[in-house]
């Protein structure tokens, strides 16, 4: 049957990508339908019970700056918060939180059920409705046909998913959920470039059988307790609890080696490539054979359960080997496993078949987000979902897509890496992937993106008001520090020396003093018995005040480096903003090598900047392209070749 209501946007899948996509589209005023195989699993944390980390926390802050739900839900469900790399520079500091699975899921569902313009419907999707080169809807497993002007597909690990425990395997999207076999087959018929990846999860342990007296306690940050959202408050956090640390040992490693003959990874049963930066314990003892021990973190799954997640022993070994290896570690000698660990193999689609908007190049109005694009991690999925939801909304409104640049957001780095370089293994975000990371910090994600989000329609009045107050306070106070001066007469040696280490010998602005190593904003404001402080409070609450102080201090201390990076960004702007028309015939570009012509024709980059990041495209090739552009590009008389004509990703 045809469902009586036609929607602007349909989102398929209710994981971290799907929920952010649906919320973003609906916030923009588009009638949006979220189709999920099970409403009870909306926002479910399928693997580790944590959000954030190095690079990942930056993405969460960016999602939050654009009005997304992940950071706010983490503040409501987070049971331990830490700032990683707190002793290092601001570019690599990152927030990480342990989350109560149930509280997090409840927070996400509450937002979905109370979002205007958003409808939920429980049915698995088996097919897409495609007319010509455009998607027009989706078909569920019982034949209900939903029509829409755009579709966002966020299928996670469900596409033809296969779960492995030892040499036993069965179809599934994750433990307890069916795989999307029909939908995967349908996508392959559409000639989208496809491949196979693998990920895994560890066994879960009953906390009542753990001897915590044998373990090292790892508490969260308590003074102050961090918050994730720019609008977050410590009072939103539930009760805070510690994690615990144990280690593998030689006996553990011997047990694992003894079970490799029954490992699906080492017997050729699993063909998909696993994540390099979240390897299974089998991979660890093989790749790091000389290492005698690996650190294992026991992470609580929630406040109302005894279940613990042993971070670091993801495995697909047979259950008897899993039980033996768990019990070989200190504190786990009598551990009871509640759920076995497993590996899951699933289809993904080569992201080089996508535009920078995450719309597929071969089917108009069809957007992909999350693990379907070859990424791994909740945060990477949420960021892609947000962008796909925004661009699906812009698509149905007849507006130009928003494609964040590499110098603008980690989201821009993530998408640019995917659509220009593709993936040969599950992609994970790190700060090292961003060449402009000093400008892309967690603390300034709102300064970079909230104004853009307001223009796009995804930032509400409450967030906009809070941001405006923060932005104005930072601007005013920074200017005051730069224009307020002290000299040896107004700042005597006995006042200057305790803060600065020596007296001042001539006139300085307060900003000059703050720029010195070891000098804090509060320290400068405390000079002259507090006479150097701002004449009025910068903010009414402590969290916003801390954010303002951090912005001011970083902006002044790192101004020289930030200005230098801004100059580099400006020099590269010409390449990033120079678009390549869709009909470019690269065979007509004089001097291009055969390899360059082949790759440019296959991947169809949208800008000169994207072209420069394709493997095998040299600076000389870019120069030839620029010359060709100035002459006036020849165009192909026919439609560009489908990037996935052979239905397989091309290895770079």
Swiss-Prot record:
InterPro entries membership: FAD/NAD-bd_sf, GIDA_C_N, MnmG, MnmG-rel, MnmG-rel_CS, MnmG_C, MnmG_C_subdom, MnmG_C_subdom_sf
Family membership: Belongs to the MnmG family.
Superkingdom, natural source: Bacteria
A Pfam match: GIDA
Gene3D superfamilies for this protein: FAD/NAD(P)-binding domain, GidA associated domain, C-terminal subdomain, tRNA uridine 5-carboxymethylaminomethyl modification enzyme MnmG/GidA
Obligatory cofactor(s): FAD
Compartments where found: Cytoplasm
Function: NAD-binding protein involved in the addition of a carboxymethylaminomethyl (cmnm) group at the wobble position (U34) of certain tRNAs, forming tRNA-cmnm(5)s(2)U34.
Keywords (A to Z) from UniProt: Cytoplasm, FAD, Flavoprotein, NAD, tRNA processing
PANTHER family tied to this protein: GLUCOSE INHIBITED DIVISION PROTEIN A, PROTEIN MTO1 HOMOLOG, MITOCHONDRIAL
Residues holding FAD: 13-18
Protein name: tRNA uridine 5-carboxymethylaminomethyl modification enzyme MnmG
Principal location class: cytoplasm
Binding partners and assembly: Homodimer. Heterotetramer of two MnmE and two MnmG subunits.
């Amino acid at each position: 049957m045809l469902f009586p209501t036609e929607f602007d946007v349909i989102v398929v899948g209710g994981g971290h990508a799907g929920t952010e996509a649906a919320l973003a589209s609906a916030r923009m005023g588009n009638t949006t339908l979220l189709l999920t195989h099970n409403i009870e699993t909306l926002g479910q944390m399928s693997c580790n019970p944590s959000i954030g980390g190095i690079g990942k926390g930056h993405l969460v802050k960016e999602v939050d700056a654009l009005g997304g739900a992940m950071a706010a839900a983490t503040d409501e469900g987070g049971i331990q918060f830490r700032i990683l790399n707190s002793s290092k520079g601001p570019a690599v500091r990152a927030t990480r939180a342990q989350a109560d699975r149930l509280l997090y899921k409840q927070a996400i569902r509450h937002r979905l059920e109370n979002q205007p313009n958003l409808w939920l419907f429980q049915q698995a999707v088996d097919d897409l409705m495609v007319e010509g080169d455009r998607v027009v809807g989706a078909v569920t497993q019982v034949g209900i046909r939903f029509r829409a002007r755009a579709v966002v597909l966020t299928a996670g690990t469900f596409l033809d998913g296969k779960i492995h425990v030892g040499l036993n395997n069965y179809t599934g999207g994750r433990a307890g959920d069916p795989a999307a076999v029909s939908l995967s087959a349908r996508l392959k018929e559409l000639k989208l470039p496809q491949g196979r990846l693998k990920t895994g999860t560890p066994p879960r342990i009953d906390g009542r059988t753990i001897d915590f007296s044998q373990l090292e306690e790892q508490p969260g940050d308590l003074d102050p307790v961090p918050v994730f959202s720019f609008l977050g408050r410590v009072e939103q956090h539930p009760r805070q609890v510690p994690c615990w640390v144990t280690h593998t040992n030689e006996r553990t490693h011997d047990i694992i080696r003894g079970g490799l003959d029954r490992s699906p990874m080492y017997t050729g049963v699993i063909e998909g490539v696993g994540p390099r930066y979240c390897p299974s314990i089998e991979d660890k003892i093989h790749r790091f054979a000389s290492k005698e021990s690996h650190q294992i973190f026991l992470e609580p799954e929630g406040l109302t359960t005894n279940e613990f997640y042993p971070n670091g022993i993801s495995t697909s070994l047979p259950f008897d080997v899993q039980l033996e290896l768990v019990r070989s570690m200190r504190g786990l000698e009598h551990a009871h496993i509640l759920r076995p660990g497993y590996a899951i193999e699933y289809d993904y689609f080569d992201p080089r078949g996508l535009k920078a908007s995450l719309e597929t190049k071969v089917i108009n109005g069809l957007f992909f987000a999350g693990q379907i694009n070859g990424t791994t991690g909740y945060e990477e999925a949420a960021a892609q979902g947000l962008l796909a939801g925004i661009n699906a909304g812009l698509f149905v409104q007849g507006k130009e897509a928003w494609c964040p640049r590499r110098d603008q957001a980690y989201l821009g780095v993530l998408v640019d890496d995917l659509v220009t370089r593709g993936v040969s293994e599950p992609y994970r975000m790190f700060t090292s992937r961003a060449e402009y990371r000093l400008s892309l910090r967690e603390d300034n994600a709102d300064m970079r993106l909230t104004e853009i989000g307001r223009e796009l329609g995804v930032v509400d009045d409450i967030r906009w008001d809070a941001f405006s107050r923060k932005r104005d306070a930072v601007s005013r106070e920074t200017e005051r520090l730069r224009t307020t001066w002290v000299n040896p007469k107004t700042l005597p040696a006995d006042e200057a020396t305790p803060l600065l280490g020596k007296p001042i010998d001539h006139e300085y602005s307060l900003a000059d003093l703050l720029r010195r190593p070891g000098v804090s904003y509060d320290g400068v404001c405390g000079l002259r018995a507090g006479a150097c402080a701002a004449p009025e409070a910068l903010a009414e609450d402590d969290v916003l005040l801390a954010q303002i102080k951090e912005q001011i201090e970083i902006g002044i201390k790192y101004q020289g480096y930030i200005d230098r990076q801004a100059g580099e960004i400006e020099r590269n702007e010409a390449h990033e903003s120079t678009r390549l028309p869709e009909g470019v015939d690269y065979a007509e570009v004089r001097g291009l090598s055969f390899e360059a012509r082949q790759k440019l024709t296959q991947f169809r980059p949208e800008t000169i900047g994207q072209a420069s990041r394709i493997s095998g495209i040299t600076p000389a090739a870019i120069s030839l392209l620029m010359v060709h552009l100035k002459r006036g590009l020849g165009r192909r008389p026919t439609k560009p070749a489908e990037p996935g004509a052979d239905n397989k990703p091309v290895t770079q």
